[in-house]
Curated annotation (Swiss-Prot):
It comes from Encephalitozoon cuniculi (strain GB-M1) (Microsporidian parasite). It comes from the Eukaryota. Residues 150-203 are annotated as: Disordered. Residues 193-221 form a propeptide. Spore wall component. It is found in: Spore wall; Membrane; Cytoplasm. This is Spore wall protein 3. The gene is SWP3.
């Protein structure tokens, strides 16, 4: 089976001891010119240079798999004594095995990026929650908390209470509730009045800006 493709561009590169492997623009231009002339290959000429040549439709290049199961390929040269390497697209397994490790000393398998290293912000995180014991000392209690600013969840019945202590008499407790409600009403009324004042001030600024713009246009005209 002949596998001809332009994906395996590394075969068309030029190897130099100083600069390594690269693909010059001349090679790409020759590839575009010869692509309509049958099977393409890299051929070594008599002077030792490599170039893109076309084998022609009458002399195709055959690529056969090794009977031992190896992924190495063999080909039939079509340029006499010149050596020719056919251009073909490697399989996914060949690409994986050709990629070396980070150090470059041992061959490694290609591993696609995995989403396991990314943790969303809403994912519960296991940690230690400190709770107050009966003696007043902080005792670590295992629990679950969510890294969020809204509605933090906590578990355990021995969590520290933030409510004010209850009074000894029922009248005192009722007075405290009434005082708290009155304070809440006052704070709500003050916040609403301040927001109304801010809105009125913004409207007056907008009106003043409109008047100034109209006056400026009338002066210019």
């Amino acid at each position: 089976m002949v596998r001809r493709s332009l994906y395996f561009l590394a075969v068309m590169g030029v190897v130099r001891s100083s600069s390594g492997l690269y693909i010059p623009s001349v090679v790409l231009q020759e590839l575009g010119i010869a692509s309509s002339q049958g099977c393409l290959m890299i051929a070594e000429t008599n002077n030792g240079n490599f170039g893109i040549v076309s084998s022609g439709l009458e002399n195709p290049v055959y690529i056969t798999e090794s009977p031992q199961g190896h992924r190495e390929v063999s080909w039939q040269p079509v340029r006499g004594e010149d050596r020719a390497v056919p251009i073909y697209a490697p399989s996914a397994e060949e690409v994986r095995e050709s990629i070396s490790s980070v150090r470059g000393s041992e061959p490694g398998q290609y591993i696609a990026p995995q989403p396991t290293g990314f943790v969303p912000a809403s994912t519960p995180v296991f940690g230690t929650i400190e709770s107050a014991s009966t003696a007043g000392a902080a005792v670590p209690v295992e629990g679950v908390f969510v890294a969020s600013t809204e509605n933090p969840a906590s578990t355990g019945s021995s969590s520290t209470s933030t409510c004010p202590p209850k009074g000894t008499a029922g009248t005192t407790d009722n007075k405290g509730k009434a005082g708290g409600a009155a304070a809440d009403d006052k704070s709500k009324s003050s916040s609403s009045s301040s927001s109304k004042k801010k809105k009125k001030g913004a409207k007056s600024l907008v009106a003043l800006g409109a008047v100034a713009t109209t006056a400026l246009f009338s002066i210019v005209m």
